[in-house]
Amino acid sequence: MESNGGGGEVRRVNLVYFLSRSGHVDHPHLLRVHHLSRNGVFLRDVKKWLADARGDAMPDAFSWSCKRRYKNGYVWQDLLDDDLITPISDNEYVLKGSEILLSSPKEDYPNVEKKAWVTRNGGIDAEEKLQKLKLTSEKIQKESPVFCSQRSTATTSTVTEESTTNEEGFVLKKQDPKTVSGQRDGSTENGSGNDVESGRPSVSSTTSSSSYIKNKSYSSVRASHVLRNLMKCGGLDTNDAVLVPLNKSRSGAFGPAWEDERRYQYHQQHNARKSFEGAWSGIKMKETIEFCKPKVAPSKPSMAPLCSQCGKLFKPEKMHSHMKLCRGMKNSSANNDLMTSNNTVKPRQQRCRNIPGNPLGHQRVLTTTLKE
């Protein structure tokens, strides 16, 4: 302990505190400070020390309580800023900080109701969206037959026009022979101009008589076409005059020639492919045969001697047999025989001379050996 000039005591305080977050208690922390106070330690002092050590926002994020004796055990006493903390021992304090929830259960209840209301509205919105989708689909279905009917009416109008032209031609062909004869008489009498004028009333009379038939045929044809277009939705109508079959190009003048050329090219390509495959297979077969052959080690250069007579190689252990069979040896032996025969001593007669002291007086022949 140390004394101060003011009479207070400076004590070293050991502060042990626990932090509890969402029901989980952390490992205890130890904080040692020097405290000068006559009245003890308050919670505001502890918060000041924790703010200096852990940050300004840390102490206010927890609710604090101290550990103290109670009867035969210990309890946690909740504290406020002005409460005095009772030590567990002489200069040791044990505190626990519980994390403060941001929202209380009372505040959560309206949020839950709001979420329920939102989910209900969301469900209502989903139902409204489904209804809107149904309405749009119905509108599309209603509009699409109108489009098809418009298209079908256009097609039926073209069909009816064609039918009218065909029927008019047919009616003109089926005129009465009397009217035709009258027209011919008029043409002979009045010329070409009067012929046209005489023909007009006949055409008008025939058309007026067949108007009922035309209307009836128009109505039947139109009804049949409308029904068919409604069944097809007007999207599958095609103009057969525009369609050109693909076989016409082949049936033309150049069709057979083109087919023959194509077949010839195909056969050429096929034969070339076959020849290439055959050559390639032959090369592969040769390579495989050469690969499968046993590889002979390169022979070492023989050290056998050469015969000086015939120039052939012979083994040293077979020298005698080679000498017997060698032609050069035989030839050399024959030459040696000739040489020996030529080098033999031949008696050579010389001129006789009289040897003095020979009473017989006959001549003595001196023989000398000469070597060639």
From Swiss-Prot:
Residues 146-211, 330-372 are annotated as: Disordered. It is found in: Cell membrane. Induction: Highly unstable; disappears during cell division but is afterwards quickly re-established in lateral root primordia and primary root (at the protein level). It holds the Pfam family SOK. Expressed during embryogenesis and in roots. One of its GO terms (molecular function) is protein homodimerization activity. Residues 149-168, 202-211 have a biased composition (Low complexity). It comes from the Eukaryota. One of its GO terms (cellular component) is apical plasma membrane. Keywords: Cell cycle, Cell division, Cell membrane, Developmental protein, Membrane. Residues 178-195, 330-347 have a biased composition (Polar residues). GO terms for biological process: cell division; plant organ morphogenesis; protein polymerization; regulation of cell division; regulation of root morphogenesis; specification of plant organ axis polarity. A motif (Association to cell membranes) lies at residues 233-234. It is a peripheral membrane protein. Residues 11-102 are annotated as: DIX-like oligomerization domain. Homodimer. Forms long polymer filaments with other SOKs proteins polymers (e.g. SOK1, SOK2, SOK3 and SOK4) crucial for polar localization and biological activity. Binds to ANGUSTIFOLIA (AN). The DIX-like oligomerization domain is required for polymerization, edge localization and biological activity. 'Soseki' means cornerstone in Japanese. SOSEKI proteins (SOK1-5) locally interpret global polarity cues and can influence cell division orientation to coordinate cell polarization relative to body axes, probably by guiding ANGUSTIFOLIA (AN) polarized localization. Belongs to the SOSEKI family. This is Protein SOSEKI 1.
